[in-house]
């Protein structure tokens, strides 16, 4: 059923909550099987998802979004495939403590237009690995790409044994529905990736939230730097996926002793220099 209003959203939350309660009882072996299948499916779809993201959002570069999708699927799988996320993690006889891995419950996943597929893949996979359910609120300008990525992960997870409603999404996202999802009493955690307003809303929701928003990443270049390498690295990073990644360099601070040399190097590589006010 498509989710286009508050009533339909509430029904979706109920379904995903029910699925998560079932999933919370899965063993580590079952979870790892689902995690692997979902990651492989996302990796296999990295190229068509990248094309879909660029076409729908009008932002970024297909080849670079392929890399991001690959990173969000294969790298994340390899990084966490051996991580224990079920049952007893450790016991300390000295202090009489036992550390147990438990799912947090239902997660609200806010996805931006700049990374509509890779962010959805990443959040869906880590939710599956930790036995949580997740509902995505995609950006309106990239909703189809985001929801397609979520559906690919979901279908692979179901085929591997996951409950059928363990991942959900809003089909026609609006600010109202996004806020409704964040403030829903059954949501236990918010993973918010987006602009400053969205991240602030997540932190102001009264729920535990992890937010990632626009940054102002500076680069400091001093006399010890390899100027050729520094300039090439900054330009490569800043132009990756048309510079839409919030962690890419936003400003360069250069000490006086090498300022002219760095400036000339940027200019020789096609960099634009603003002068005056």
Model-identified regions with their sequence ranges:
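Rossmann-like NAD(P) dinucleotide-binding subdomain of oxidoreductase/dehydrogenase enzymes
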Residues: 88-229
């Amino acid at each position: 059923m498509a989710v286009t209003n508050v009533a339909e959203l509430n029904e979706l939350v109920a379904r995903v909550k029910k699925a998560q309660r079932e999933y919370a009882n899965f063993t580590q072996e079952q979870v790892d099987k689902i995690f692997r299948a979902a990651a492989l499916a996302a990796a296999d779809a990295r190229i068509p998802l990248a094309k879909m993201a660029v076409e729908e959002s009008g932002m970024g570069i297909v080849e670079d979004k392929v890399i991001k999708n690959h990173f969000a699927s294969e790298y994340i799988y390899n990084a966490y495939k051996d991580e224990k996320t079920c049952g007893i993690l450790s016991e300390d006889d000295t202090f009489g403590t036992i550390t147990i891995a438990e799912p947090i419950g239902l997660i609200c996943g806010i996805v931006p237009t700049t990374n509509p597929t890779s962010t959805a893949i990443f959040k869906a996979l880590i939710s599956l690995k930790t036995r949580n359910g997740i509902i995505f609120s995609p950006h309106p300008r990239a909703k189809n790409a985001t929801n397609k990525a979520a559906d690919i992960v979901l279908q692979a997870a179901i085929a591997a044994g996951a409950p059928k409603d363990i991942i959900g999404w809003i089909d026609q996202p609006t600010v109202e529905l996004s806020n409704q999802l964040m403030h829903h009493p059954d949501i236990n955690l918010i993973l918010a990736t987006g602009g400053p307003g969205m991240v602030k809303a997540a932190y102001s929701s009264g729920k535990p939230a992890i937010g990632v928003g626009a940054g102002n990443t500076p680069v400091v270049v001093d006399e010890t730097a390899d100027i050729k390498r520094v300039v090439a690295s900054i330009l490569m990073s800043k132009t990756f996926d048309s510079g839409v990644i919030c962690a890419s360099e936003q400003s360069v601070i250069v000490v006086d002793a090498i300022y002219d040399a760095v400036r000339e190097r940027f200019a020789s590589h096609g960099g634009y220099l603003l002068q005056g006010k």
